[in-house]
Amino acid sequence: ERDVPKNQYFLLEKAGIRTPKIFKDPKKIDRLAIVKVAEAKRAYERAFFLCSSYKDYKEKSAELLNKKTITKKDLKKAIIEEYVLGAPVNFNFFYSPLSNELELMGTDTRRQTNLDGILKLPATEQLEVLKHIKPKYIETGHYNVTIKESLLEKAFDLGEKFVAATKKFHPVGIIGPFALQGAVVAEEGKEDIVIFDVSMRIPGSPGTLFTPYSGYLYGYSISYGERIGLEIKKALELGKLDLICT
C-alpha cells in the first residue's frame, strides 16, 4: 500500500523502475505536479489537483478544504509527484511461482468522470465548460488498449524487475496477478514507460481479456479468473499448493 514502510514506491525505486519525481515537502514544488489526496467522503477515491508552486498548492488545497472535498489529515498524507504527460497504460501481469514465469495478461486504460465527458466536447465547448466546472478524475471503469510491439520487451523488463524486488523485500514476493500503471512518454526521439502506481491484486478491468497478449501464449485469450483457476489446478496436480498461498 501507499502509506506503509517498504510500500509500492519503495519497491519501484529498488526495482530501478522509472517513476515521477516525488515531492515530500510541498515547499519544494518547482514544476507542474499532481497532488493525490484521499477524498473526505470516499477514502478509496482520490481527489487530484495540479499545481506548479507552493503558493499554487496552498491556494488549491485551501479551496478543496473549504468545500470539505478533502481533510487536513489526508492532505498531510497526500502524494505529490511530478506531472508526467503521456498515453496512459495499465500493464496487467501474472507471475507464476510454479513456472517462475511472468505473463502479460493484457493492457488497458481508465475511464474517469467527469474528465472523459470534458474531453469528448469540441474545443470551443470545453473552454466554456471549464469556466464553470473543474475536471474530476473519478474512476468509473476501464477499456482495453494495445501498445506497439517495440514496447513489449520494455514492459516485460519492468514487470520482471518488480517481481524480483518483491521477492527480495517481501518474501515470498508477489504471487499471481498485479498491474504496473503508468504512461508511455515520448522524449528525444524515443518512447519510455513511466510508472505511477501499482495494483497488487487482480486488476479492476475485465477488458484485458480482449487484448491479444494472453492469446499469444495460450492460443486463445483468457481472463484473470481462468488464469488463476489454471494456476490452482496445476498447483494441486504438482502438490505445490503452498507455493501459491500465503
List the predicted regions and their residue ranges.
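Phosphate-binding site of ATP-dependent enzymes
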Residues: 58-135, 150-162, 167-170, 179-194
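Active-site ExK catalytic segment of metal-dependent nucleases
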Residues: 8-9, 36, 108, 196-201
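ATP-dependent carboxylate activation and anion-phosphoryl transfer catalytic cores
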Residues: 144-246
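Conserved anion/nucleotide-ligand pocket segment
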Residues: 32-56
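Conserved N-proximal alpha/beta basic substrate-recognition cap immediately N-terminal to
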Residues: 1-31, 40-41
